[in-house]
């Protein structure tokens, strides 16, 4: 009997059911993955008991000798995998990391140019409902209506017109490669700081599957889960020592008190795992799987935003399928496939309904699935969406998905 089962049977039952859901449902949520048992062991360790306000060697509490080792390991490993000079591993989240960057060099009312949420950006990049949209003047940019991809000449034009203090590149639902070098040139043209948010593609960057922004951006932020397969948390990479000093002050005492030392330990484990050849192979396979799934869906008549993918995710515009993103998400769920509704470029529906779904391959790749399975999954997706109101067919598809998942256990 586990400690949780003995102490809190109700919670234990919920965790047990969640474990079963993760095992037998097909996870195509682009921002989710499976952390290793080693990462989870670090997260559940006695390090959760320790307060450690400040930074390694300069704490406001005694008894930090060993948690200093954990943080030092996380920093050194992050520097190595990203080929970076300055890293802060204390942010509790990706949004918090972005907030720290803004507060380190901007003041309220300054102008930030960032990707519109409905075109693939992120809430923390300036959405009106986010702190970023409330505190700063946001100039949104989007994709070309013709190509559904970024048009860098248009971005240059917009930057010159608005002269932002900061430009944010990176996205939560953009399937194509981002040219960080061109973003640097645009930022330099108007004297803006450049922040690259690589929360979604960090694992791909580490493995060399996607170009790195580190040589170009003043700041790089990321979550440590998603393609990195670590614990839920954030990191910040700074280009210079002066910027790193600003970041450290913005994180603590600016935004946070005590860092989560058990999570930082989990980050250290994940960064070590990211140095392995297996990790690199998985990132390469993640993109191969995404390209295969995208190709198969396109051949079945689905409208794939921008026509292809260069990374771990794809966006499906469902307008030609006469189904909303909300209804497609529900149908897929009944078929045992977990995805999320998503706005598409030039969206006409509300964010609660949407015209699209976002699909990603990190989690199923971590399970060991490859191109052959992607072809099967495309069939299951087509069946679910074209039979969204037929519970019998959806149930039969769910059985097939369960059988597929049973051949690729999450934790062997």
Curated annotation (Swiss-Prot):
Reaction catalysis annotation: (6R)-5,10-methylene-5,6,7,8-tetrahydrofolate + glycine + H2O = (6S)-5,6,7,8-tetrahydrofolate + L-serine
EC number: 2.1.2.1
Cofactors, names only: pyridoxal 5'-phosphate
Major localization class: cytoplasm
Pfam families documented for this protein: SHMT
Pathway assigned to this chain's UniProt record: One-carbon metabolism; tetrahydrofolate interconversion; Amino-acid biosynthesis; glycine biosynthesis; glycine from L-serine: step 1/1
InterPro entries associated with the record: PyrdxlP-dep_Trfase (IPR015424), PyrdxlP-dep_Trfase_major (IPR015421), PyrdxlP-dep_Trfase_small (IPR015422), Ser_HO-MeTrfase (IPR001085), Ser_HO-MeTrfase-like (IPR049943), Ser_HO-MeTrfase_PLP_BS (IPR019798), SHMT-like_dom (IPR039429)
Site (Plays an important role in substrate specificity): 225
Record keyword Amino-acid biosynthesis present: yes
Coiled coil: none
Statement: the UniProt record of this protein carries the keyword Amino-acid biosynthesis: yes
Binding site for (6S)-5,6,7,8-tetrahydrofolate: 117, 121-123, 242, 350-352
GO CC annotation terms, alphabetical: cytoplasm
Family: Belongs to the SHMT family.
Function in brief: Catalyzes the reversible interconversion of serine and glycine with tetrahydrofolate (THF) serving as the one-carbon carrier. Appears to be specific for THF as the pteridine substrate, since the use of tetrahydromethanopterin (H4MPT) is much less efficient. Also exhibits THF-independent aldolase activity toward beta-hydroxyamino acids, producing glycine and aldehydes, via a retro-aldol mechanism. Thus, is able to catalyze the cleavage of L-allo-threonine and L-threo-beta-phenylserine.
Assembly description: Homodimer.
Protein name: Serine hydroxymethyltransferase
